[in-house]
Protein backbone atom coordinates (compact mmCIF):
# COMPACT_ATOMS: atom_id res chain seq x y z
CA UNK A 1 0.00 0.00 0.00
CA UNK A 2 1.21 3.50 -0.81
CA UNK A 3 2.80 5.34 2.10
CA UNK A 4 0.55 8.37 1.51
CA UNK A 5 -2.64 6.31 1.75
CA UNK A 6 -4.53 6.09 5.03
CA UNK A 7 -6.42 2.84 5.42
CA UNK A 8 -9.72 3.31 7.24
CA UNK A 9 -11.31 -0.05 6.47
CA UNK A 10 -10.97 -2.67 3.71
CA UNK A 11 -13.41 -0.57 1.63
CA UNK A 12 -12.52 2.92 2.80
CA UNK A 13 -9.20 4.49 1.86
CA UNK A 14 -8.13 8.14 1.91
CA UNK A 15 -5.75 9.43 -0.76
CA UNK A 16 -4.25 12.78 0.32
CA UNK A 17 -4.40 15.40 -2.41
CA UNK A 18 -1.84 18.03 -3.32
CA UNK A 19 -3.35 21.47 -2.66
CA UNK A 20 -4.07 23.41 -5.83
CA UNK A 21 -2.75 26.99 -6.01
CA UNK A 22 -5.20 29.48 -4.52
CA UNK A 23 -7.42 31.14 -7.15
CA UNK A 24 -6.36 28.63 -9.81
CA UNK A 25 -9.28 27.68 -12.08
CA UNK A 26 -9.61 23.99 -12.79
CA UNK A 27 -11.95 21.28 -14.02
CA UNK A 28 -13.29 18.26 -12.17
CA UNK A 29 -13.26 15.01 -14.16
CA UNK A 30 -15.01 11.97 -12.74
CA UNK A 31 -14.41 8.47 -14.08
CA UNK A 32 -17.51 6.52 -13.02
CA UNK A 33 -21.26 7.06 -13.42
CA UNK A 34 -22.48 10.64 -13.27
CA UNK A 35 -23.34 12.42 -10.06
CA UNK A 36 -25.65 15.30 -9.36
CA UNK A 37 -24.89 17.55 -6.42
CA UNK A 38 -25.97 20.81 -4.85
CA UNK A 39 -24.42 23.00 -2.19
CA UNK A 40 -25.69 24.66 0.94
CA UNK A 41 -23.68 27.65 2.08
CA UNK A 42 -23.56 31.28 3.03
CA UNK A 43 -20.63 33.66 3.10
CA UNK A 44 -19.30 36.87 4.64
CA UNK A 45 -17.58 39.52 2.55
CA UNK A 46 -13.80 39.42 2.41
CA UNK A 47 -13.41 36.29 4.54
CA UNK A 48 -11.82 32.99 3.53
CA UNK A 49 -13.87 29.98 4.55
CA UNK A 50 -12.96 26.33 4.92
CA UNK A 51 -15.78 24.00 3.92
CA UNK A 52 -16.27 20.31 4.59
CA UNK A 53 -18.39 18.38 2.10
CA UNK A 54 -19.86 14.91 2.49
CA UNK A 55 -20.86 12.66 -0.39
CA UNK A 56 -21.81 8.98 -0.36
CA UNK A 57 -20.27 7.06 -3.32
CA UNK A 58 -21.52 3.73 -4.58
CA UNK A 59 -21.78 2.01 -7.93
CA UNK A 60 -19.42 0.26 -10.32
CA UNK A 61 -15.76 0.87 -10.93
CA UNK A 62 -13.75 3.56 -9.19
CA UNK A 63 -13.93 7.35 -9.17
CA UNK A 64 -10.94 9.38 -10.24
CA UNK A 65 -10.79 13.15 -9.83
CA UNK A 66 -8.06 15.41 -11.15
CA UNK A 67 -7.60 19.13 -11.62
CA UNK A 68 -7.63 20.73 -15.08
CA UNK A 69 -7.98 24.21 -16.50
CA UNK A 70 -11.58 25.33 -16.64
CA UNK A 71 -13.53 28.15 -18.27
CA UNK A 72 -14.47 31.46 -16.66
CA UNK A 73 -18.00 30.15 -16.22
CA UNK A 74 -16.82 28.56 -12.96
CA UNK A 75 -17.35 31.93 -11.28
CA UNK A 76 -21.10 31.89 -12.00
CA UNK A 77 -23.65 31.62 -9.23
CA UNK A 78 -25.19 28.22 -10.02
CA UNK A 79 -23.45 24.88 -9.85
CA UNK A 80 -22.90 22.97 -13.09
CA UNK A 81 -23.46 19.28 -12.51
CA UNK A 82 -24.42 15.97 -14.09
CA UNK A 83 -26.84 13.19 -13.23
CA UNK A 84 -25.61 9.71 -12.31
CA UNK A 85 -27.35 6.55 -13.40
CA UNK A 86 -26.66 5.38 -9.87
CA UNK A 87 -25.96 7.90 -7.11
CA UNK A 88 -22.34 7.60 -5.90
CA UNK A 89 -20.97 9.28 -2.82
CA UNK A 90 -17.67 10.70 -1.65
CA UNK A 91 -16.18 12.94 1.00
CA UNK A 92 -14.55 16.23 0.05
CA UNK A 93 -12.97 19.22 1.75
CA UNK A 94 -13.33 22.63 0.12
CA UNK A 95 -11.74 26.05 0.46
CA UNK A 96 -13.62 29.19 -0.59
CA UNK A 97 -11.82 32.30 -1.82
CA UNK A 98 -12.63 35.99 -2.23
CA UNK A 99 -15.17 37.41 -4.66
CA UNK A 100 -14.23 36.92 -8.29
CA UNK A 101 -12.35 33.66 -7.78
CA UNK A 102 -13.27 30.56 -9.76
CA UNK A 103 -13.83 26.96 -8.73
CA UNK A 104 -10.56 25.23 -7.89
CA UNK A 105 -10.37 21.48 -7.43
CA UNK A 106 -7.44 19.20 -6.64
CA UNK A 107 -8.13 15.57 -7.44
CA UNK A 108 -7.44 12.06 -6.25
CA UNK A 109 -8.80 8.52 -6.56
CA UNK A 110 -11.72 6.81 -4.84
CA UNK A 111 -11.65 3.05 -4.37
CA UNK A 112 -14.76 1.13 -3.30
CA UNK A 113 -18.29 2.28 -2.43
CA UNK A 114 -17.34 4.07 0.79
CA UNK A 115 -14.12 5.80 -0.16
CA UNK A 116 -13.07 9.29 0.84
CA UNK A 117 -11.01 12.01 -0.77
CA UNK A 118 -10.31 15.71 -0.48
CA UNK A 119 -11.21 18.45 -2.93
CA UNK A 120 -10.31 22.14 -3.01
CA UNK A 121 -13.06 24.49 -4.10
CA UNK A 122 -12.95 28.27 -4.44
CA UNK A 123 -15.87 30.55 -5.03
CA UNK A 124 -17.22 34.02 -4.38
CA UNK A 125 -17.71 35.20 -0.81
CA UNK A 126 -18.99 38.71 -1.50
CA UNK A 127 -22.08 37.35 -3.20
CA UNK A 128 -22.14 33.88 -1.65
CA UNK A 129 -22.23 32.46 -5.16
CA UNK A 130 -21.45 28.81 -5.76
CA UNK A 131 -18.78 28.38 -8.42
CA UNK A 132 -19.83 26.41 -11.47
CA UNK A 133 -18.43 22.87 -11.63
CA UNK A 134 -18.19 21.03 -14.92
CA UNK A 135 -18.25 17.25 -14.50
CA UNK A 136 -17.58 14.48 -17.02
CA UNK A 137 -17.55 10.76 -16.36
CA UNK A 138 -17.33 7.18 -17.52
CA UNK A 139 -18.88 4.05 -16.08
CA UNK A 140 -15.78 1.87 -15.70
CA UNK A 141 -17.73 -1.11 -14.40
CA UNK A 142 -19.62 -1.49 -17.66
CA UNK A 143 -17.01 0.26 -19.78
CA UNK A 144 -19.70 2.63 -21.03
CA UNK A 145 -18.85 6.25 -21.80
CA UNK A 146 -21.30 8.66 -20.20
CA UNK A 147 -20.19 12.09 -21.40
CA UNK A 148 -22.57 14.94 -20.71
CA UNK A 149 -23.56 17.67 -18.33
CA UNK A 150 -26.51 19.28 -16.61
CA UNK A 151 -27.18 22.09 -14.19
CA UNK A 152 -28.44 22.57 -10.66
CA UNK A 153 -28.62 25.29 -8.05
CA UNK A 154 -27.53 25.61 -4.43
CA UNK A 155 -29.24 27.15 -1.41
CA UNK A 156 -27.50 29.11 1.32
CA UNK A 157 -27.05 27.84 4.86
CA UNK A 158 -24.24 27.12 7.29
CA UNK A 159 -22.51 28.61 10.33
CA UNK A 160 -19.25 30.50 10.81
CA UNK A 161 -16.55 29.44 13.26
CA UNK A 162 -14.18 32.37 13.58
CA UNK A 163 -12.86 33.22 10.10
CA UNK A 164 -13.97 29.84 8.76
CA UNK A 165 -17.26 28.35 7.65
CA UNK A 166 -18.55 24.77 7.52
CA UNK A 167 -21.04 23.77 4.91
CA UNK A 168 -22.13 20.83 2.79
CA UNK A 169 -22.59 19.52 -0.68
CA UNK A 170 -25.23 16.82 -1.14
CA UNK A 171 -26.13 14.25 -3.75
CA UNK A 172 -29.70 14.63 -5.03
Curated annotation (Swiss-Prot):
Segments of skewed composition (Gly residues): 147-159
Superkingdom of this protein's organism: Viruses
Disordered as annotated region, ranges: 147-172
Designated name of the protein: Uncharacterized protein D-172
Amino acid sequence: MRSDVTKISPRRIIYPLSPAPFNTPCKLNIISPFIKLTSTHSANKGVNHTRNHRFTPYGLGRLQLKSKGCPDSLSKSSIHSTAWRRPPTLTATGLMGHSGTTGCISGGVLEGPESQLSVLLLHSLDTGDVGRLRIAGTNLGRRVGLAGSGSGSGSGSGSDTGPFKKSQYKIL
